[in-house]
Regions:
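Short acidic, glycine-rich surface-loop motifs adjacent to enzyme active sites
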Residues: 192-209
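Subtilisin-like serine protease catalytic core
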Residues: 87-128, 134-185, 198-201
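Glycine-rich, acidic and aromatic/proline-enriched surface loops and short helix-turn segments
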Residues: 13, 155, 194
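Extracytoplasmic/secreted envelope proteins and their assembly/folding machinery
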Residues: 4, 8, 38-41, 47, ...
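Solvent-exposed, acidic/flexible segments
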Residues: 1-4, 37, 78-81, 132, ...
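Autoinhibitory propeptides
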Residues: 8-90, 120
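Solvent-exposed loop/turn segments at secondary-structure junctions
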Residues: 29, 39-41, 59-61, 105-109, ...
Length: 209
């Protein structure tokens, strides 16, 4: 925030007249997100420390038009054998001890393939992650995409014999899209910052199926 101090002072002064609200600083992109009255935008653009102004662009997840058909349980799923993930397991590279953040629609943290290796957020984050969209601890996945991706990454195969690529990895859930797959740039950046601030090793942002 040191590099943003002059702009922040300018914005905070305008909160008293209700021309500015909901100020949020980002460090990973040196950006400030806020709501402003349209009449104030031109004046804001004249500030010497502001390089650019843009909308908090809405982002949408791309889903398959047709549901993916369930396939019979196999010993090893095709995606794993295609990239030889099972070969490296034999050398001990199973993701053990590695924390992976899945930034998506949330996760079913009670899923049998995931619940035994969830990130320990302590009392501050009791549900093993955070809901950026609603700014609370409810990371429940009402869409299914986030849980699907989490399983692809680190499902441990408890419910059958299909597993994720890194079945011993630790899962952190960062909910950045709502149940319809809608989000915005501010929430995506906030999600990445949350993961980095909590010492994540890898972050996966809403991968395509």
């Amino acid at each position: 925030e040191a590099n943003q101090s002059e702009v922040l002072s300018f914005l905070n002064a305008e909160t008293r007249s209700n021309r500015v609200s909901d100020i949020k600083c980002h460090w990973i992109t040196n950006m400030i997100n806020c709501k402003v009255e349209s009449s104030f935008i031109y004046e804001l653009a004249q500030h010497p420390d502001i390089a650019a102004i843009s909308y908090n662009k809405k982002e949408y997840m791309l889903f398959n038009e047709q549901p993916i058909k369930a396939e019979p349980v196999r010993g090893k799923v095709e995606n794993i054998t295609k990239i030889n993930a099972d070969d490296v397991w034999s050398y001990g590279y199973t993701g053990k001890g590695v924390v992976v953040a899945v930034l998506d629609t949330g996760t079913n943290i009670d899923h049998v393939d995931l619940k035994d290796h969830l990130w320990d957020g302590g009392s501050e984050y009791p549900n093993h992650g955070y809901n950026i969209v609603e700014e609370n601890h409810d990371v429940t996945d009402f869409n299914g995409h986030g849980t699907h991706c989490a399983g692809t990454i680190c499902g441990d195969g408890t419910s059958g014999t299909q597993t994720g690529m890194a079945p011993d990895a630790i899962l952190m859930t960062v909910k950045i899209f709502d149940s319809e797959g809608n989000g915005n740039v501010n929430d995506i950046i906030s999600g990445v910052e949350f993961a980095v601030e909590n010492n994540i090793e890898f972050a996966v942002v809403a991968p395509d199926d």
